[in-house]
Amino acid sequence: MATSSAASVDMEDIQTVDLMSELLRRMKCASKPDKRLVFIGPPGSGKGTQSPVIKDEFCLCHLSTGDMLRAAVAAKTPLGVKAKEAMDKGELVSDDLVVGIMDEAMNRPKCQKGFILDGFPRTVTQAEKLDEMLNRRGAQIDKVLNFAIDDSVLEERITGRWIHPSSGRSYHTKFAPPKVPGVDDLTGEPLIQRKDDNADVLRSRLDAFHKQTQPVIDYYAKKENLVNIPAEKAPEEVTKVVKKVVST
């Protein structure tokens, strides 16, 4: 009885509008098919732009390894405690621990209809361990979306970015220039470039990405669930392609 009472009190503390919104969301999602997706792509390829759109459209949860690790550590779950011990020693969290934490995260109600994995797997070993875990759940990855884009296009996209530091407003010298070069439109304050938004840093990051990720792309290509997304297109065009791919 105590457990029931505690649960009742918790529910009573939730605003009616929040309860209704969640009930409506779950009713809308009930008829959606399950989808288990992996998004792969280099920095600047648009994965981060597309993930929330697809998450909401198909009632999926977005699983980021960094967010999951932080949540498990904060909640002091058994796996979170082990992960914290490794991090405190300056060690990398093992693939088995990461996949275990991911397995726990997939039990949440918001992951009922499936998930988008972003930033994982990064290696073939991780991909294999992910498959093993999903097999134990009687599931598998449905689609792997590779946001394919030429490095030269990425360089133009990223090195042209300028930021207004206090507001976060972003500009681009070619695609979305400020009214006055180097100056924020609203405040007249100077714009800055992030340290990582330069050609040398980008080339280094892209080189590391290609070396690390190409074997993963090949792994999924052999499983015939890999789809290349033309990520050089405008975001709204990419969204149309991604929705079509995920829907089929």
UniProtKB/Swiss-Prot annotation:
It comes from the Eukaryota. GO terms for cellular component: mitochondrion; plant-type vacuole; plastid. Keywords: Acetylation, ATP-binding, Cytoplasm, Kinase, Nucleotide-binding, Transferase. One of its GO terms (molecular function) is adenylate kinase activity. ATP binds at residues 44-49, 161. AMP binds at residues 65, 70, 91-93, 119-122, 126, 194, 205. Its EC number is 2.7.4.3. It is found in: Cytoplasm. Its main location: cytoplasm. Residues 160-197 are annotated as: LID. NCBIfam families: adk, PRK00279.1-2, PRK00279.1-3. Belongs to the adenylate kinase family. HAMAP family: Adenylate_kinase_Adk. Catalyzes the reversible transfer of the terminal phosphate group between ATP and AMP. Plays an important role in cellular energy homeostasis and in adenine nucleotide metabolism. This is Adenylate kinase 3. It comes from Arabidopsis thaliana (Mouse-ear cress).
